[in-house]
């Protein structure tokens, strides 16, 4: 009986220690992520959902976003691609079919890189969608 009690106590202690270390590791990772992204410029290119419109995710992911990322050069920290799945409100259409986001160090460098390539970017958009994107430029604060 004492052996079972001691064994149970040791297993429980091991579980608690392991769980707390995992939580601490996740917290540390999230703090590092926040610290490295804080102050970056986030350019979100959002494609609103509309009945009858199309969006070619495969082309967007494999051709368009890498093309634009190439224009941004060393100013680009990372980019993400999101595919809309559902609305946050039940029985409502999703607000966006897709969102592409570029994280850059400098807004001025971003503008300088995009300006001479604007026509090529606009022409390429027609290859994967008939949706007019909404663009939001913001600063990551946390």
Segments from the language model and where they lie:
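Bacterial Sec-dependent N-terminal signal peptides
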Residues: 1-25
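Macromolecular interaction modules
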Residues: 20-142
């Amino acid at each position: 009986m004492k052996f079972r009690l001691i064994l149970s106590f040791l297993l429980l202690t091991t579980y608690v220690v392991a769980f707390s270390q995992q939580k601490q590791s996740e917290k540390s990772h999230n703090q590092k992520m926040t610290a490295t992204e804080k102050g970056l410029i986030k350019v979100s290119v959002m494609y609103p959902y509309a009945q009858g419109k199309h969006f070619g995710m495969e082309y967007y992911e494999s051709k368009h976003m890498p093309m634009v990322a190439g224009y941004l050069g060393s100013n680009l920290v990372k980019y993400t691609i999101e595919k809309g799945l559902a609305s946050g409100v039940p029985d409502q259409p999703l607000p966006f079919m897709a969102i592409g986001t570029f994280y850059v160090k400098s807004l001025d460098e971003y503008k300088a890189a995009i300006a001479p390539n604007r026509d090529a970017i606009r022409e390429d958009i027609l290859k994967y969608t008939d949706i007019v994107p909404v663009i939001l430029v913001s600063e990551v604060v946390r």
